[in-house]
Amino acid sequence: IVQNAHRIVEGQMPIKGGRDDDFFMIESAGLACQRLICDLVSTRLPKSYGYDPVRDIQVLCPTKVGPTGSVELNRRLQAILNPPAPDKPQIMWEQSGRVLRCGDKVMQIKNDYDIPYERDGAEAGVGAYNGDMGIITAVDPESRAVTVQMDDRKYIYGADQLAELEPAYAVTVHKSQGSEFPAVIMPVADV
């Protein structure tokens, strides 16, 4: 990765890796690329390297729109990695069709300096920040509240705070700045 990062900074093409390398370039576009990304996240990387598809693999997108944008990839990856089930409560927005479901990977999309969090069952502090990621561990469809575990912090988001969360199976490069991930998949057009 370091060698290819230097090559890219110098305006050179990256060296394509082999099976034992940590850097791969796979040519694909449009819907075929979308299907490939979903297969890499859900099957190939977990099977080959033991990655957890939700916790370890992050898709980084240049944009939100299009078949390989974060919006559409989140919709597809949620359907594959965390499909609806009778034992998975969820909250759905009728107008947009957006769904938050127990087990979903989510991102805080704006700073909230006042939301309290717990550590080890006791209130520990306040604040969730733009770019923080976690997993929804509980959903109350009646009150429209969700519980999100972000590292060692547990937050409870009320109905009026749910707009602060977005699915995070795929996020834009912009939103990921400052984060680190064990495995990254990044669709890049016209390379």
Task: Give the ranges of each region predicted by the language model.
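Conserved helicase motor core of P-loop NTPases
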Residues: 1-126
